[in-house]
Amino acid sequence: MTNQPDTFKKVISHAKEYGFVFQSSEIYDGLSAVYDYAQNGIELKKNIREYWWKAMVQMNDNIVGLDAAIFMHPTTWKASGHVDAFNDPLIDNKDSKKRYRADVLIEDYCAKIETKIDKEIKKAEKRFGDSFNKDEFISTNTRVISYQDKIKSVLSRMGKSLENEDLDDVKALIEELEIADPLTGSKNWTDVKQFNLMFGTKLGASAESAMDLYLRPETAQGIFVNFLNVQKTGRMKIPFGIAQTGKAFRNEIVARQFIFRMREFEQMELQFFIKPGTQVKWYEYWKEARMKWHLSLGMG
């Protein structure tokens, strides 16, 4: 685990050095969490997208494609719940002026406890040698059990608080755990507030008459609103699927992890419509089919 950040830095360096990914607008100091796919990166991305499209659409008689617009009527996002619920719980540190996702701070706290569990296991492995039984040790060692109970308790409370939109309790949990700013060590926190992840824009000739729109945060809604159009014009019978690839946008405040969490990204998505009562059958089918596809890319 200690080598993971260094390995990740090497991957990022390699991606830039060999023309796969560049920082967007780099000559103007760049733009956080926005990247350009370079000469080799775009070819790799194009190959994966075309391979995906052939496997998902062209090789299946009951799956068709769609290219929905990025702009959609704002009621779409109200009906889908994105306007009211597509949020991240954010908290600011008053001293460092840095903003964090409250749930990530708590998850990082739990990750540190996981590290303590790993250390206990390694110590026991070294002590007992070949006779060491990892599963038995984890289920019987009082310290490990205590650590596990702590993690379960913290994550359970956080989950319930977020589900109930009790942001005061999320802050209380951070304070009770004495979670500090990762940069300064300060524990001087603001209240937790919900921040909507959709980018807003305007449609119209003037500011007064312009309609408020959003850059789509996902491609799925374009499929859902076109369901009847596709079904009627394509004479599709359930079960059938609609696939789409395209840009999506999310205003990630705490963006990190290189191209794995970007503000502008591309999705490849299939929505498969089935008859009630056949969920398990189709879930197993697609789980196996998609796993085989990913393994065919050498991801095993």
Predicted features along the sequence, with ranges:
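TRNA-recognition modules of translation machinery and tRNA-sensing kinases, especially anticodon-binding
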Residues: T2-G300
